[in-house]
């Protein structure tokens, strides 16, 4: 089985949007979508020293709750939002009218610059550790990004309300429900699709303004699965 772990906000909509299509891509084995509440990479007390064990604990808790053991899993695919975390500090822009973070072409708008600087440091340190980690709980593990978040990649919207997320997820799931080829074409052949080498794909997202732009390296995972199926 493939365990898809998603750590980001408005999680139920993410399950709805991606779940049906991914189940069709990975149809030889079941896909279990486990939603981590909130973003584990920015959780209080989580740092590069303990992030791997924290993700491992999530996987173990999920397995225990569903009566699985480590050998029941083929792989763990962890999908994270970049949340523009790789932007330089001068792209974190003070806007006292911003009650919530706002992701714009020129940077992150916030009423608390220091807090965002700290969050970005924590998130990028943790992602650096995770992307170099090949196994968690003896299960092959890889982390893939959605930039600047899942809504941005799937629907080209950066700052969606919960209502928009719900509506967009429903429409997306409906559109690709019985059309896995169209889903794969959209994810793997769009201007936002980052393909090729896994390590290179992370070096790409670190650069310039890329982590606030529309990019995902999930196609690397999808194309590998298709290749496996064909062999």
Question: Where are the regions a protein language model picked out?
Answer:
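Short, small-residue-biased leader/transition segments that mark boundaries at the very start
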Residues: 2-5, 9-13
